[in-house]
């Protein structure tokens, strides 16, 4: 996975984990899983509901939080001669 992918993915999953936000995880085969993210690493997400499931990231299509979350991220500095919107 690219470094940029990790820069987006890790803060998003981490805020969901820290704030115990309920999530729906859609797999590439269309199955919907629900629960809270207990932990994650480069390859898997541990999803806790009545049981804890290990879900491989390559099988995940979409992660949908039950409520809006604010993901901390750094904004790159605007290029010289451009205005920030």
From Swiss-Prot:
GO terms for cellular component: cytosol. CDD domains: Hfq. GO terms for molecular function: RNA binding. Keywords: RNA-binding, Stress response. GO terms for biological process: regulation of DNA-templated transcription; regulation of RNA stability; regulation of translation, ncRNA-mediated. Residues 10-69 form the Sm domain. InterPro entries: Hfq (IPR005001), LSM_dom_sf (IPR010920), Sm (IPR047575). PANTHER family: RNA-BINDING PROTEIN HFQ. Belongs to the Hfq family. Homohexamer. RNA chaperone that binds small regulatory RNA (sRNAs) and mRNAs to facilitate mRNA translational regulation in response to envelope stress, environmental stress and changes in metabolite concentrations. Also binds with high specificity to tRNAs. This is RNA-binding protein Hfq. The gene is hfq.
